[in-house]
Regions:
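Active-site acidic carboxylates
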Residues: 1-95
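Gly-rich Lys/Arg/Thr-decorated short loops/hinges at beta-loop-alpha junctions or inter-strand turns
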Residues: 99
Length: 99
């Protein structure tokens, strides 16, 4: 059996104090609860045990054609120019060291 660790949505826009989702409180929660370091530690342990590492992230192309317009969380991403793929916003945070 193959084992894996799945890391979801640990992108700058969501968990960084400089991200556009700062007002939602995700970055503050992550900071107050040491989420990034705890996740980095879990990732390091998983790698040492030869787990497959899977990073999943949300993001939209420049024209936002994939954006779910009725989504409570992502419905206004285009208006705020948030979550653009291939930018700092949708890069996995440095703490997690994508390899």
């Amino acid at each position: 059996m193959t084992k894996a660790i799945i890391i979801c949505d640990f992108i700058n826009e969501i968990v960084s104090q400089d991200g556009k989702f700062k007002g939602k409180g995700y970055a503050s929660f992550a900071e107050q609860n040491n989420v990034l370091q705890n996740t980095a530690n879990a990732l390091e342990k998983a790698r040492s045990l030869n787990f497959k590492v899977i990073f999943v992230k949300i993001g939209f192309s420049a024209d936002y054609k994939e954006q779910p317009k009725n989504s409570l969380l992502f419905g206004k991403a285009d208006q705020f120019q948030a979550l653009k793929l291939d930018t700092w916003a949708t890069s996995i945070v440095d703490t997690l060291k994508v390899e």
